[in-house]
Amino acid sequence: MDERLVSSELDNHESAIEQSLRPQRLAQYIGQEKVKDNLKVFIEAAKMREETLDHVLLYGPPGLGKTTLAAIIANEMGVNLRTTSGPAIERPGDLAAILTALEPGDVLFIDEIHRLHRSIEEVLYPAMEDFCLDIVIGKGPSARSVRLDLPPFTLVGATTRVGLLTAPLRDRFGVLSRLEYYTRDELSEIVIRTAELFEVDIDSLSALEIARRSRGTPRIANRLLRRVRDFAQVLGNSSITEEVAVDALERLQVDKLGLDHIDRKLLMGMIEKFGGGPVGIDTISATIGEESHTIEDVYEPYLLQIGFIQRTPRGRIVTPDVYSHFKMEVPNHD
């Protein structure tokens, strides 16, 4: 898969940069107002009762701030954050080692929690419900179960695919919060904040121009800002003006809706070779040279969100909005 500026997934080399940009408190966190307001109440109530916060499940598309919120929850509660991920916990013993190392009140963040193996989930159930760990010592007829007490802790799980969570695991979370795509104004505010951290001058129109092409996702907005900053420093006077921003984004082939060359390749392939559809996902895959699951998981979600593609029983079709965007006539199929 080609590297994409508009991918909402985190590149390995971006981790340190993202870490430096993350807000530390709810008051600094831009957007997700309903989620923030509810978390503020739950956190304050837990602190007033001197209890741990209920387990929290954060779900929604990638790049919207789930990891950031987990760290903020720990900061607001005044406790340590322990971080791991579903794929990193390969055996029940791995989870047991993590749980027994927790201090009272700690926040344990498990990213991609939907990828936990079922056998590991079963170890997690009593830990979440009763703060205890059941381990089996020995093998065969002499094997016996021993229960270990754990310190009270808060589990924060994050997932982009909440439908893959088992019902027993999902039901053990007391707080379930869905993160939504950001508005253009919220993204513009994030761009301005990030520019300040980068010590780069930017005006409001330039920030809006970057925001409108960021697909509702802060991670993409910050990535585009970094690339626009490069153009401003090399080709301009280091300040980001609207003219510099538009020129840079056009050079980067990210259009006014945030579509890139791969989006255009997919959409134009459907139009030019299949009359706009309906066309099956496997056929699209063969046409543009991408795996079917990559199209479904990476490319389609945004195109569905903005109404450029529809799924039908007979396959995918492009909508009239696509023809309008590309300044093409809508074909008459009558």
From Swiss-Prot:
Its EC number is 3.6.4.-. GO terms for cellular component: cytoplasm; Holliday junction resolvase complex. It catalyses: ATP + H2O = ADP + phosphate + H(+). Residues 1-182 are annotated as: Large ATPase domain (RuvB-L). Its main location: cytoplasm. Mg(2+) binds at residue 67. GO terms for biological process: DNA recombination; DNA repair. It is found in: Cytoplasm. Residues 256-334 are annotated as: Head domain (RuvB-H). SUPFAM superfamilies: P-loop containing nucleoside triphosphate hydrolases, Winged helix' DNA-binding domain. ATP binds at residues 21-22, 63, 66-68, 129-131, 172, 182, 219. CDD domains: AAA. Residues 183-253 are annotated as: Small ATPAse domain (RuvB-S). Homohexamer. Forms an RuvA(8)-RuvB(12)-Holliday junction (HJ) complex. HJ DNA is sandwiched between 2 RuvA tetramers; dsDNA enters through RuvA and exits via RuvB. An RuvB hexamer assembles on each DNA strand where it exits the tetramer. Each RuvB hexamer is contacted by two RuvA subunits (via domain III) on 2 adjacent RuvB subunits; this complex drives branch migration. In the full resolvosome a probable DNA-RuvA(4)-RuvB(12)-RuvC(2) complex forms which resolves the HJ. Has 3 domains, the large (RuvB-L) and small ATPase (RuvB-S) domains and the C-terminal head (RuvB-H) domain. The head domain binds DNA, while the ATPase domains jointly bind ATP, ADP or are empty depending on the state of the subunit in the translocation cycle. During a single DNA translocation step the structure of each domain remains the same, but their relative positions change. Belongs to the RuvB family. This is Holliday junction branch migration complex subunit RuvB. It comes from Bacillus licheniformis (strain ATCC 14580 / DSM 13 / JCM 2505 / CCUG 7422 / NBRC 12200 / NCIMB 9375 / NCTC 10341 / NRRL NRS-1264 / Gibson 46).
